[in-house]
Amino acid sequence: MSISPQEVKKLRDATGAGFGDCKKALSVAGGDFELAKKKLKEMGIVSADKRSGRDAKEGRVFSYVNTERVGLLLIACETDFVAMNSDFVAFGNSLIKQLVESGRDILDEHQELEIKNLAATIKENIYVSKVYISNIASNELVKNYLHGDHSKIGVFVKFKIDDVLKMQDEKLNNFAMDLALHVAAFSPLYLSVNDICLNYIKEQEEIFMRQMESSGKPENVVKGIISGKLKKHLGEIALLEQGFVKDDKLTVKEKIEEVSKLILSKIEVVEFKYLSVG
């Protein structure tokens, strides 16, 4: 039977076993997820590598962008020393380039084997923790950024540009890079307040209500305080509502509008991604 890459990825995430081993186990199990997990244990795959049980709390973020896609990759390891190792860094840079150029966010058998070989050479638990690949349209501009020599934070920001002739505008590109730096510094969780789920907003409102229970203030005053706290909190986690890193008198949304007027073309942030070690 045919086993999809998504099924293989699910089993791989659950067990830590390699791509090829997961695919083989699923095939033997006829696609049954729980049975495939059992087969991996029977094969001794899940616990075969003693290093796989050790904590890998360090790592490095890698990024690559071409005209069609942008990608972020987080590879975990046990020590910061290994995260700076030249072989580790070269492998990560090569892998993210391969993934972006292929458009895949799942490693193939050869790439899985390369990781195993690297782990055996370096003698640490090394694995791909997160991969994110995003397509770039012809009217979109992307800026990616890796923070510091150790690259423990990696981000990209994607803009939609109404007038594609403005794509090379210096003011636009400088702002785009500044916003990538902003995302790295402030690690927003959402693009806009509208993207925040209602359940989260309700839970946060209830937290503020409990905090005000013993305040002794009139109900209408309490409601006003809670509303203000909620607005402030949501603004802190939504990119467009955050104070811009280079001019906190303006929100990111207001800065975007300002740059749009400067370059005589509407620009819009349509996506961002933030990855960090730990």
UniProtKB/Swiss-Prot annotation:
Region (Involved in Mg(2+) ion dislocation from EF-Tu): 79-82
Gene source species: Borrelia duttonii (strain Ly)
Major location (coarse): cytoplasm
Coiled-coil intervals, chain numbering: none
Gene Ontology, cellular component aspect: cytoplasm
Subcellular location: Cytoplasm
Function, in words: Associates with the EF-Tu.GDP complex and induces the exchange of GDP to GTP. It remains bound to the aminoacyl-tRNA.EF-Tu.GTP complex up to the GTP hydrolysis stage on the ribosome.
The keyword Cytoplasm is assigned to this record: yes
Family membership: Belongs to the EF-Ts family.
Statement: the UniProt record of this protein carries the keyword Zinc-finger: no
Record-level Gene Ontology MF annotations: translation elongation factor activity
Keywords attached to this entry: Cytoplasm, Elongation factor, Protein biosynthesis
A Pfam family the protein falls into: EF_TS
InterPro entries: EF-Ts_dimer_sf (IPR036402), Transl_elong_EFTs/EF1B (IPR001816), Transl_elong_EFTs/EF1B_dimer (IPR014039), Transl_elong_Ts_CS (IPR018101), UBA-like_sf (IPR009060)
Cysteine pairings via disulfide bonds: none
Gene this protein is translated from: tsf
Protein name, entry field: Elongation factor Ts
